[in-house]
Amino acid sequence: LFRSAVAYRDRRTEGMDRKVYEFIPEDDLYGRTGIQKQIFNTIYQLMAVKEQQPGQLEWAKSMLMIPDYFHFLLTGKKVQEYTNATTTQLVNPVTKDWDIELIDMLGYPRRIFHKIQNPGYELGRLTEDIQNRVGFDCKVVLPPTHDTASAVMAVPTQEEHALYISSGTWSLMGTELKEADCSKVSMQHNMTNEGGYDYRFRYLKNIMGLWMIQSVKKESAPDMGFGEICALASKETIRSFVDVNDARFLAPENMTAEVKSACEEAGEQIPQTIGELAAVIYHSLAKCYAKTAEEIEKLTGIDYSRIQIVGGGANAHYLNELTAEYAGKNVYAGPTEATAVGNFAAQMIAAGELKDLKAARACIAESFEINIFTSNQDTE
């Protein structure tokens, strides 16, 4: 380990997209990988290392994502789990393996990319050192190590085509496809094709999510609970909107000031209180969800009857109400701890306790409370 891990919201990768596009045009990169451009993707992280600390790539023997590094510490074995590996923007969606031609093109050393294994793969047992520390031994099974991939496993539906939002710091809104859509139209809509359990593709869009509320709370109302903030927002009449996908909200020095500035620049009412700030953010998120739902329906040709919300955002009742209102679809919210539940489900399938993903989702639907928020335009 050459140094401490870096934060993905830092500025190391600024301009690294242009460096990557010197080797491969942006359109071609999407056509090869199907992954949405995010400046913190591993493809740009590695380019930052190559440009800023080239010696580190020359010396490196392995590139492990954080979950894979934990698995290495537990077992002493190095592999890269499929769902997380796809988000590097270096995996071929057809072969489900590293795109070696692309890796060579970018000048990254092949040796650092280890074998990709699927969720459910039995990696091994705890190392002797770990056994001595914890007092027991056990098998280590790979879950979907990308948090959204685990969360999507926990979407409690039996519908073949479900529309979901994994709602937390980020809002990941999408559906599942059997084959990746790497078309130019898909790219223009900034959709991504991330790997999922059983080689399903999580066809989704990354939306800024509750990071905005978390930041405003920290700055303006650190002692107030999220439930209280939701309640205040529901009583406000302000109807200003901001583009929640604007990069200005990714890592601003002050989120409160940034939201106010965005409203002022758009000639809209400027929120003053924590309730007004929250109302602007919640309405803006819900409006974005509705627009994204329409985009996904057009891209897939499927009319989705409901929206399934999993993750911590399932507790944001006011946001769920607004989502149902703006999207014109019923919202089914829960479970809130979807990432942990999906992780556990993958391990239960591997252990033979559950037959498959369909059985796991049926079990989850029966085991957790699901709150329903009804749309006035309900067609179910």
Which positions does each model-derived feature cover?
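Carbohydrate-associated surface elements
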Residues: D10
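A conserved helix-loop-beta module that forms one wall/lid of the active-site cleft
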Residues: I100, L106-G120, F344
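Short linear loop/turn motifs
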Residues: H114-E122, I229-S234
